[in-house]
């Protein structure tokens, strides 16, 4: 018989800040490492946009990580970027707890809701130590459902939870009941709605040219802003970076625009957590003009293939050791689902995302020329919504076509 565990995460874009411990930077680096690697692995082309929430995925993965043991735990520690900063399991869970607490203490300049839940098969023997870890480090609710006999009812309950926690932006994660052998579904939901600190004037939004794939000229609603914004040019990325802060200055959207209209692939090849952090450190205020298209994104991914390509394989195999969940080595992750939604307009941003794991029972150097007085986002670009203090990437995407 096969038993499944699904992990889901729902998120909406833009977070706020808190006093940062040195170790919290390490969790942010691990989050960004995972997110940027996923961006490179997800399928994209000149006509396809990409959007995901690294924060959502890493939180959902973190809840599975809490139940991993042995070589499965070792592989996750390495490929999540924890090993590079010498973070062990205890420290990782402590940092997730600190992150949750600090987020709950944020000011109310925007709407930010974060929730986690564990939906378990009725009567299945989840270890108390595991549920305690989910409650302590992730503030997770514990919910029981019957996936074997009342699968449709269970899925309605889960989809209602997802919709409620994302204010209806993500209305469902499952289109049909999961396999009857599902034993646990881990849910992470985050909803964010933020207002630009410097709003775009709606009367100045006009149809303007955008080059899909860097070559195909189309007309799109283009917003215009004249303001003092943080900006830098990075020679390694060969791109301009512009920061659009949200009210409260805790979160911002960073636009990464390659200088070449067809330069997105080259940009992605050199964009790492290290090159990104160095570029962000070199941003400074400048009076400038910005043109940015309005856009909406709605994406859904199966993350198992890209995660496996990143070296995360044991947790998906018959050799997985998730004995920290039930006390036995008969569970493995069947799949990881992720769904994300974003809208960017003159007022600000609203976003949400959902991530899911299924666990089954077996049977360089910088040169900074004078920055451009104008940044016109009229060709493919990368954007991210980040915590301005820790640089934690909450949402990440690339726009190829509008």
UniProtKB/Swiss-Prot annotation:
GO molecular function (one): serine-type endopeptidase inhibitor activity
Pfam families in the record: Serpin
Cross-referenced InterPro entries: Serpin_CS, Serpin_dom, Serpin_fam, Serpin_sf, Serpin_sf_1, Serpin_sf_2
Coarse class of the protein's main subcellular location: secreted
GO biological process: immune system process
Induction context: Induced by blood feeding.
Signal peptide limits: 1-16
Glycosylated residue positions: 164, 230
Location of this chain's protein in the cell: Secreted
KO phenotype (gene knockout): RNAi-mediated knockdown results in reduced feeding success rate in nymphs. Longer feeding time. Higher mortality in nymphs. No significant effect on Borrelia afzelii transmission from infected nymphs to mice.
GO CC term (a single one): extracellular space
Top-level taxon of origin: Eukaryota
Keywords of this entry: Blood coagulation cascade inhibiting toxin, Complement system impairing toxin, Glycoprotein, Hemostasis impairing toxin, Immunity, Protease inhibitor, Secreted, Serine protease inhibitor, Signal, Toxin
Summary of the tissues where the protein is detected: Saliva (at protein level). Salivary gland. Midgut. Low-level expression in ovary.
Function: Serine protease inhibitor that modulates blood feeding of ticks on vertebrate species. Inhibits the intrinsic and common pathways of blood coagulation in the host. Inhibits host thrombin, factor VIIa, factor Xa, factor XIa, factor XIIa, plasmin and activated protein C. Inhibits host trypsin and kallikrein. Reduces host complement activity. Does not affect proliferation of CD4+ T-cells and neutrophil migration.
PANTHER family: GH10112P-RELATED (PTHR11461:SF211), SERINE PROTEASE INHIBITOR, SERPIN (PTHR11461)
Domain notes: Has an unusually long reactive center loop.
Subunit structure: Interacts with host thrombin/F2. Interacts with host coagulation factor VII/F7 (activated). Interacts with host coagulation factor X/F10 (activated). Interacts with host coagulation factor XII/F12 (activated). Interacts with host coagulation factor IX/F9 (activated). Interacts with host plasmin/PLG. Interacts with host protein C/PROC (activated).
Entry's family note: Belongs to the serpin family.
Name of the molecule in the record: Iripin-8
Organism of this sequence: Ixodes ricinus
């Amino acid at each position: 018989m096969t038993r499944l565990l699904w992990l889901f995460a729902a998120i909406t874009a833009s977070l706020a800040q808190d006093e940062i411990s040195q170790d919290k930077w390490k969790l942010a680096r691990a989050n960004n490492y995972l997110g940027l690697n996923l961006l490179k692995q997800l399928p994209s082309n000149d006509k396809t946009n990409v959007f995901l929430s690294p924060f959502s995925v890493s939180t959902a993965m973190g809840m599975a990580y809490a139940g991993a043991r042995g070589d499965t735990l070792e592989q996750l520690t390495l490929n999540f970027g924890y090993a590079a900063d010498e973070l062990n399991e205890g420290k990782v869970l402590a940092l997730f707890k600190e992150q949750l607490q600090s987020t709950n203490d944020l000011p109310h300049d925007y709407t930010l809701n974060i929730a986690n839940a564990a939906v378990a098969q009725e009567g299945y023997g989840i270890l108390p130590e595991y549920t305690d870890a989910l409650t302590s480090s992730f503030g997770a609710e514990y919910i029981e459902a019957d996936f074997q006999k009342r699968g449709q009812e269970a899925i309605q309950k889960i989809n209602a939870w997802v919709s409620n926690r994302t204010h209806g932006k993500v209305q469902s994660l499952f289109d049909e009941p999961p396999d009857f052998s599902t034993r646990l579904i881990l849910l992470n939901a985050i909803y964010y709605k933020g207002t630009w600190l410097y709003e775009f004037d709606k009367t100045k939004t006009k149809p303007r040219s955008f080059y899909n794939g860097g070559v195909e000229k189309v007309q799109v609603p283009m917003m215009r802003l004249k303001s003092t914004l943080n900006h830098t040019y990075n020679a390694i990325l060969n791109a301009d970076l512009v920061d659009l802060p949200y009210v409260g200055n805790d979160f911002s959207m960073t636009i990464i625009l390659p200088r070449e209209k067809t330069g997105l692939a080259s940009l992605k090849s050199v964009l790492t957590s290290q090159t990104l952090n160095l570029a962000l450190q070199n941003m400074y205020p400048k009076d400038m003009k910005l043109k940015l298209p309005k856009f909406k994104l709605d994406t859904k991914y199966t993350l198992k293939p890209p995660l496996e390509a990143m070296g995360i394989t044991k947790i998906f195999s018959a050799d997985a050791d998730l004995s920290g969940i039930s006390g036995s080595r008969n569970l493995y992750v069947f799949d990881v689902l992720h769904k994300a939604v974003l809208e960017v307009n003159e007022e600000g941003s609203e976003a949400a995302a959902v991530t899911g794991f299924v666990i089954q029972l077996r049977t360089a150097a910088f040169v900074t020329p004078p920055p451009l007085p104008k940044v016109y986002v009229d060709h493919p670009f990368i954007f991210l919504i980040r915590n301005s203090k820790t640089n934690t990437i909450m949402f990440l995407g690339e726009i190829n076509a509008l």
